[in-house]
């Protein structure tokens, strides 16, 4: 996708909002090179 750069901002917003969602799984791992960072942040917030 050409708009892959939108994913990190979207996921961070979801995490910050406190939604209990598998945000890392919501997006293809091959398009989310920062997936692990999001998972780590999500784990800390939750």
Swiss-Prot record:
It comes from the Archaea. This is Uncharacterized protein AF_1387. It comes from Archaeoglobus fulgidus (strain ATCC 49558 / DSM 4304 / JCM 9628 / NBRC 100126 / VC-16).
